[in-house]
Amino acid sequence: MKITILSLFPSIITPFFENSIMKKVISKGIISCEVISIRNFSDDKHKRCDDIPYGGGAGMVLKAQPISAALDYVNARSKTTIFVSPSGLKYNQKLAYDLSKKDELVIICGRYEGLDQRIIDLYVDFEISVGDYVLSSGEVAALVIIDSVYRLLEGVINPNSLLEESFSCECGLLEYPHYTRPYEFKGLEVPNVLLSGHHEEIRKWRFMKSIEKTKKNRYDLYLKYLEMRGENDGFNKKN
C-alpha cells in the first residue's frame, strides 16, 4: 500500500514514520508513505494557501488552487482520496478495514475553517471525521486513519490478535479486560478463572466481561449487539 499525505505542516506528520514499528513496516515494503507540502503548489508569490470565505464568516478557507495542483501532481483521481473533516462520515473499524484493502490512499489534511467545497466535489472519495469533536489540525486526524489502517495490512500484526480486539469480532463488542503479573496489586487480585487453565471457562468469562464493558462504556454498541441477537434490554434504557 502507498499513502500520500497532503499537508500545510509536513513536520507534524513525518516523525510518525520514524517510530520503530512504522519504520519496520516501511523497511519491509509493506507500506510506503509520502508527505507533500501543499504550499509548494501555491501560485501565490508568498505561498499563501488560504483566503476569506465567500458569504462572510469567521476564519479562513483553504484555497482550491494549491490543493488541486498537488492532487493532480500525485494523480489523485486514480487513487482513493480522503479529506479529514469534522463534518465527514464518522470513522469506525469497518471503514478502516475497507481502506486497508485499497492499493493507494491520498489524505488531505484540513486547516482553518475548512476546504473549498469544489475540491471535495472534484476529487474526494471519502470525507471522514474521526469523532464528534473539532481538532485544530487535520494532521492529527490523518495519523489516526493511517495508524488504524496500516496495522490491518498482512504481515504487520498477528491475525489472531486482530480478531480479539474491540470492534473486530462479529458481535461488535469491546475487548475484555487484561491482567498480567503480579497476581496482587494494591489489594486487587487477578480473577481466579484466568489462573485455572480451563480454556472454555476463560473464553466464557472474557465474553461476559466484553458484554459488561460494552454496556457500560458504549451503550449504543450494546444495543446493536442485542438487536443482532434478536433481544432487548427490557425498557431499552440503562440500568
UniProtKB/Swiss-Prot annotation:
What Pfam families does its record include? tRNA_m1G_MT (PF01746)
The answer to whether UniProt assigns keyword Signal to this entry is no
Q: Which residues cross the membrane?
A: none
Query: Which family is it part of?
Result: Belongs to the RNA methyltransferase TrmD family.
Please describe the quaternary structure of this protein: Homodimer.
EC numbers on record: 2.1.1.228
Q: Which organism is it from?
A: Borrelia turicatae (strain 91E135)
What InterPro entries does its record include? Alpha/beta_knot_MTases (IPR029028), tRNA_m1G_MeTrfase_C_sf (IPR023148), tRNA_m1G_MeTrfase_TrmD (IPR002649), tRNA_m1G_MTases_N (IPR029026), tRNA_MeTrfase_TRMD/TRM10 (IPR016009)
Give the GO terms filed under biological process for this record. Answer: tRNA N1-guanine methylation
Instruction: Return the broad EC class.
Output: transferase
Subcellular location, record wording: Cytoplasm
* Entry keywords, A to Z: Cytoplasm, Methyltransferase, S-adenosyl-L-methionine, Transferase, tRNA processing
From what superkingdom does this record's organism come?
Answer: Bacteria
Q: Which residues bind S-adenosyl-L-methionine?
A: 110, 130-135
Annotated protein name in UniProt: tRNA (guanine-N(1)-)-methyltransferase
Please provide one cellular component term from the Gene Ontology annotations of this protein: cytosol
Location, primary (coarse class): cytoplasm
Function in brief:
Specifically methylates guanosine-37 in various tRNAs.
Keyword Transferase part of the UniProt annotation: yes
Lineage of the organism: Bacteria, Pseudomonadati, Spirochaetota, Spirochaetia, Spirochaetales
Q: Which Gene Ontology molecular function entries are recorded, alphabetically?
A: tRNA (guanine(37)-N1)-methyltransferase activity
What does it catalyze?
Answer: guanosine(37) in tRNA + S-adenosyl-L-methionine = N(1)-methylguanosine(37) in tRNA + S-adenosyl-L-homocysteine + H(+)
Query: Which gene is transcribed and translated to give this protein?
Result: trmD
